[in-house]
Amino acid sequence: MSIEIHASAKNLNLWYDSNQVLHNISLDIYKREVTAFIGPSGCGKSTFLRCFNRMNDFVSNCKIKGELIIENIDVCSVNTNVVLLRAKVGMVFQKPNPFPKSIYDNVAYGPKLHGLAKNKKKLDEIVEKSLTSVGLWEELSDRLKDNAFELSGGQQQRLCIARAIAVKPTMLLMDEPCSALDPFATSVIENLIQNLKKNFTIIVVTHSMKQARKVSDKVAFFESGKLIEYNTTDEIFKNPQSSKTKRYIVDHL
């Protein structure tokens, strides 16, 4: 298991207008591990997740103070190239959101945008490798021209993951990636997350304690915009240090 730090937050605070949503968050995210963010609705876990690729920029009157460093990139700096940041830090949302394009073009869009493929052959290789990584190549290699909306929900979500990794990120953010999926598709995604950590650092927000326990190496528990506890998954579930953490886990298992 890696001990190399991939991202580090120090005294991170965030406001929407005068409402403070995050309070002095400090934690390190380690390379090629899965870190789960858990906590009640409105606790700030998704807001904190969106700090990693500046998705909070789309929220008006959002103000951030503190430090968030990802691979020597000062994420909060006004000088940071946000387009390149979002290529390095991919994101998968709650509901599958494929582009209204073919399966092939969904995956090829990012590499073409960022100039990662010099020719059609190279682009084909990226598409095949990305779809293979999420277990879709064998299922869909003869359907690449089909519209992505024709896929099942689980396939669409895996396609969105393939689209994210096609631009060669080092980190993947997943905001409740299974919340709109059936149990079978959820199991497929959970197994995929465990496999993808061989090549990517993954942060997943989840309301499912079973999912957090299954897929993660470390767990961060949030409440009221504060980081209450952060430890290995085994320690969080077997020996939580905070009574708040213990109560939340017991109530949601």
From Swiss-Prot:
Binding, ATP: G39, P40, S41, G42, C43, G44, K45, S46
Source domain of life: Bacteria
Annotated coiled-coil segments of the chain: none
Keyword line: ATP-binding, Cell inner membrane, Cell membrane, Membrane, Nucleotide-binding, Phosphate transport, Translocase, Transport
Entries under Pfam families matching the protein: ABC_tran
Isomerase as UniProt keyword: no
Listed InterPro entries: AAA+_ATPase, ABC_transporter-like_ATP-bd, ABC_transporter-like_CS, P-loop_NTPase, PstB-like
Chief location: membrane
Domain ABC transporter, first and last residues per copy: 7-249
EC identifiers of the protein: 7.3.2.1
Membrane topology: Peripheral membrane protein
CDD domains xrefs: ABC_PstB_phosphate_transporter (cd03260)
GO MF term list: ATP binding; ATP hydrolysis activity; ATPase-coupled phosphate ion transmembrane transporter activity
Annotated PROSITE patterns: ABC_TRANSPORTER_1 (PS00211), ABC_TRANSPORTER_2 (PS50893), PSTB (PS51238)
Subcellular location: Cell inner membrane
Catalysed reaction, written as an equation: phosphate(out) + ATP + H2O = ADP + 2 phosphate(in) + H(+)
UniProt xrefs under Gene3D superfamilies: P-loop containing nucleotide triphosphate hydrolases (3.40.50.300)
SMART domains (alphabetical): AAA
UniProt KW Membrane keyword: yes
GO cellular component, one term: plasma membrane
GO biological process, one term: phosphate ion transmembrane transport
Its biological purpose: Part of the ABC transporter complex PstSACB involved in phosphate import. Responsible for energy coupling to the transport system.
Similarity comment: family membership: Belongs to the ABC transporter superfamily. Phosphate importer (TC 3.A.1.7) family.
Description of how the protein assembles with itself and partners: The complex is composed of two ATP-binding proteins (PstB), two transmembrane proteins (PstC and PstA) and a solute-binding protein (PstS).
The protein's name in its UniProt record: Phosphate import ATP-binding protein PstB
